[in-house]
């Protein structure tokens, strides 16, 4: 996304280089082809302005003129509403609620174990790997019916799942044969131009594109 960062813009994103949820936000920005300045921040080298803007001391922060957002889900929905093309959420309320619920499940069932994967407790790491592998395998059959997660169209749910799938090798997780539909789904995500555009230099090294 270096090319995007070099253009003048009123919108600024502060992100680290490795977190999956920050990557998900960058995917949305790339899908929308937003003119955005992306500042990659190291945890021990935060600019003073970020400390002033974000009361939760987290890095992920979007600034759009006078608006400051620091929750990933709010950022993604704001971007989808602010830049409606291409749409990443359904128009009708029922399907929109369904997709929000799916994102909630992704965060609860998958993202919730990621902190354990970075820990020093070997038992906790092994347990987190098993939970993530089992939960991913459980949703694999859904991709036999539709090209994207419970949908014919690419949505914010897929933007959240793509970073996880990209990091499986980094996490030391190998899907079983029953997870083949999920791996094929991941390959479709990785082939999208916006996905390759969204990668930080560190993320590019996770495995060959």
Predicted regions mapped to residue ranges:
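GST-like fold's C-terminal all-alpha helical module
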Residues: 106-193
